[in-house]
Amino acid sequence: EPARLVLPEGADAAEAEAVVRAVTLTRDLVNTPADRMGPEGLENAFRSLAERFDATVRVVRGDDLLAQNYPMIHAVGRAAGEAPRLLELEWGEESHPRVAIVGKGVCFDSGGLDLKAAQFMRLMKKDMGGAANAMGLASMIMAAGLPVRLHLLVPAVENAVGAGAFRPGDILTSRKGITVEVDN
């Protein structure tokens, strides 16, 4: 028999359902094994969320990140088997105040060439918890129909070991022109 939610008298069932769905989404994203929740899996979940609320999605993937001036996202994910990507969701009326939410979507963080010790790598599938929480929050905002223009941004990458990985000591230039030296 399916579970049944019992609410106190006077509770808003729609609000409770929105919270439960958001918490479940967040929990399921974080707990999904990395072989099923890489950048592509996160993009699929992102698209499903957008579809539920008739939101617009834009994805910048692979070398297009460089062409559109997202070099840091590209650098972190370029050594992985799945292309890095920037996921963007837009929802709400143009006349409403803009609310932007950004969630870190490092689907697995091996440490790249600064390889993490095994005991620290075990739970690195959860390094995309920021993205999962941002998506859960966006779900609640859209379910509530809040009078905002929502902009959700999730850089989805895997920080992998490979010939294309950035090295300790490399200096990368960000979208704003700020240089960043890679360290452990």
Where do the model's predicted regions map?
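Short, surface-exposed, polar/charged, turn-prone segments marking secondary-structure boundaries
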Residues: 85-88, 128-130, 178-182
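Short acidic, glycine/serine/threonine-rich loops at helix termini
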Residues: 68-72, 111-119, 161-168
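Alpha-helical metal-binding/catalytic segments enriched in His/Glu/Asp
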Residues: 46, 98-101, 110, 114-158
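A glycine- and small/hydrophobic-rich beta-loop-beta segment
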Residues: 147-184
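Charged, low-complexity, helix/coiled-coil-prone segments
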Residues: 70-81, 131-145, 172-179
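Glycine/charged-rich beta-loop-alpha catalytic/anionic-binding loops adjacent to active sites
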Residues: 24-29, 97-101, 107, 111-124, ...
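N-terminal hydrophobic/helix-forming segments and targeting peptides
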Residues: 1-107, 143
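Short alpha-helix boundary/capping motifs
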Residues: 36-40, 131, 163
